[in-house]
Amino acid sequence: MTYVIGSECVDVMDKSCVQECPVDCIYEGARMLYINPDECVDCGACKPACRVEAIYWEGDLPDDQHQHLGDNAAFFHQVLPGRVAPLGSPGGAAAVGPIGVDTPLVAAIPVECP
C-alpha cells in the first residue's frame, strides 16, 4: 500500500508535502505532483503537510479519486508524452528535478480559470 496524490493537487502543487517526505519520493509533473509507489515507505509524513488535502492513504481513497491510484503509478511505469522511456524509480525527486509533463489523465483535466 502507498499514499496517493489526488486531483486536488492539479494546478495547485503546494509542494509542502515534498519538504516533509524523508525519502524524496514525490515528483513534480507539469500540473501535479506524483508519489512513486516503489519508493514510498508509507510513513505518512506527506499527508498532514498537504494544505489542499490532496494526499490519501491508498486504502482510504474516496470513490472520485480511485483513478489516481493507477495514475500515480503510471507516471513512473509508462512512457510519458515526449519521453522515450518510463521514469521508473530514479531514487529521489531532487536528483531528477521537475519532469515537466503529466500523465494523459491529468493532462486531460480542463484548466480552471481564476
UniProtKB/Swiss-Prot annotation:
Coiled coil: none
Induction and repression of expression: A member of the dormancy regulon. Induced in response to reduced oxygen tension (hypoxia), low levels of nitric oxide (NO) and carbon monoxide (CO). It is hoped that this regulon will give insight into the latent, or dormant phase of infection. Induced in C57BL/6 mouse lungs 3 weeks after low dose aerosol infection with H37Rv bacteria.
Pfam families: Fer4
Domain 4Fe-4S ferredoxin-type: residue ranges: 31-60
Names of the cofactor(s): [4Fe-4S] cluster; [3Fe-4S] cluster
InterPro entries tied to this protein: 4Fe4S_Fe-S-bd, 7Fe_ferredoxin, FdxA_Actino, RnfB_subfamily
Keywords per UniProt: 3Fe-4S, 4Fe-4S, Electron transport, Iron, Iron-sulfur, Metal-binding, Repeat, Transport
UniProt: [3Fe-4S] cluster binding residues: C9, C17, C50
Name used for this protein in its record: Ferredoxin
Source organism (scientific name): Mycobacterium tuberculosis (strain ATCC 25618 / H37Rv)
